Amino acid sequence: DDLKLEATKVSYHLRESGEKVAVIGGFNSESLFTPVEEMGQKTTLLDRQSLLQACGRGYFIVGILGPGQEPTNHALHDIAALKSDLEKWNRKMVLLFPDEEQYKKFQPTEFPGLPSTIIYGIDTDGNIQKQITESMKLSSSAALPVFIIADTFNRVVFVSQGYTIGLGEQLMKVIHGL
């Protein structure tokens, strides 16, 4: 009964669509959120507006964050590392918090170098997160962060949920394919 363990190398190839970018789902760009002005001590909630109003026509990124959670922190550092690329793209990135309490926990000073194209806000009533979770058939709405790249024709071309290595690079790969 002398069993010997032997390592076997297996080649792995991730198949990719031949198209540059594929539409993988839908998302309503008229969804409302509450934009927030000023990070830190003084918080001003602005009037609710749609993502379309905030971002203008074209593509945009939406992220639902879990402040203080490692997967969110990791994602924000990845995004900060690609600040100049994201700013050159010149499209809005809307980073949303589940509620005002979560927003107040966020410390932007922990993430120096985030792109200037970011709009912070609150996912009023959790509608945006719920819509993304349902339309993209994600496993659980609790696993944050969630990021999508979508356009104002309600097409989603990228989704990521939870802990993701190289999120910034993944976003840029899709952006360059648009």
Model-derived features with residue positions:
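Structural microenvironment flanking redox-active thiols in thiol-disulfide oxidoreductases
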Residues: 60, 64-114, 127-133
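A short beta-strand-turn-helix
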Residues: 21-60, 68, 77-81
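Oxidative protein folding and maturation machinery
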Residues: 1-40, 71, 84-87, 127
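Loop/turn elements at helix/coil->beta-strand transitions in domains of secreted/extracellular proteins
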Residues: 55-60, 87-93, 115-117, 144, ...
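Thiol-/selenol-based redox modules, centered on thioredoxin-like
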Residues: 3-22, 142-178
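Short acidic-hydrophobic, aromatic-tinged amphipathic segments that line or gate anion-handling sites
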Residues: 117-127
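Short amphipathic alpha-helix with an adjacent loop that forms part of the alpha/beta core around
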Residues: 50-54, 131-138
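Structural micro-motif
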Residues: 115-119, 134-148
